Amino acid sequence: SDNNQQGKSAQQGGY
């Protein structure tokens, strides 16, 4: 997974 910043929420993946 990747770290994407969408809209006003920061979604972090790849845990």
Swiss-Prot record:
Q: Which domain of life is it from?
A: Eukaryota
Tissue specificity statement from the Swiss-Prot or TrEMBL entry: Brain.
Q: Which residues carry this modification: Tyrosine amide?
A: 15
What are the alphabetically sorted keywords of the record? Amidation
Name by which UniProt lists this protein: Scotophobin
Organism of origin is Rattus norvegicus
